[in-house]
């Protein structure tokens, strides 16, 4: 037992009180073999005894780091002294519930990897997560991170997890690669307004049905929402605008989403990548915001799009000699009044001359 922090004061016959140093040998009744809420221990000094209660936690903490977790416990509440949870601390454990303490700042790589965790309570003090924390946590149904101070959701945070609901904090700026890969039970998610980046395959093959994107987002990486079979709607919200000339939705971002019927492009996006909506036949209408300055090869070909509204006065640039920007059977491309001739003479757009008119 470590008696650091135990302060004992003795009252002597002369009426004075003095600090008394206590050694482990003078303590009885203590056992750390099992966690208990209250354990009575007794100090014996020169024939005098004093008893008091202590709580035995199922964890060991050294210098603020969780160093050991006793096995065989379904629920654990971490003591307030824990500042960080190290790599693989609960990996493969049979624990069902963990209450993370206020004061906890970071959680290490694979901390709960392949565990049976069902419920976890996150503190307001949490600032940093490392990768793969809830990888293969099939029993985890909800993760409420909304009160934390996280700015980044790391790569592979919830890969193959059973999460049905994830609430993200307003402080979040980045969702890293494959953060929600194959989360088949996740149905909806709202991306916080401060998020600027969604990483490679972040939501690939997830079960989401609707997504709300902030208008200030500047990077949606390749295959971010690739093959989401239940995705029906992607909408935008917010007044934040970022004037980043490289802001881009990258290639194949929404390819293979057969139920997608509505897609809104965030206002800050400047470049639309190759094969952006490939294979999506339910979408029939699309609006391209005025900030879009470039549309890459076959961005909207192989889709069900029939009507397009392009809000830019200047035609978005096309660099390919053979563009395949829209389906051959598109019925109309509406552009601003006074810009019809610009579009009809612009590279790529001239392939659709007889479809271009004003809105």
Give the predicted meaning of each segment:
Residues 3-7, 38-40, 330:
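Exposed beta-strand and adjacent loop surfaces of beta-rich binding modules
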Residues 8, 41-43, 64-66, 78, ...:
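Extracellular/surface recognition and adhesion modules
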Residues 87-89, 108-111, 131-133, 154-157, ...:
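Consensus positions within tandem repeat domains that build extended binding/scaffold surfaces
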Residues 60, 70-84, 93-106, 115-128, ...:
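Structural signature of tandem-repeat unit edges
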Residues 1-18:
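Solvent-exposed, low-complexity, repeat-rich "mucin-like" stalks and linkers
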Residues 54-58:
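Interdomain boundary/hinge segments at the C-termini of tandem beta-sandwich modules
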Residues 16-52:
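Serine/threonine-rich, repeat-prone extracellular segments and beta-strand-based repeat modules
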Residues 321-324, 341-353:
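Short, aromatic/basic amphipathic alpha-helical patches
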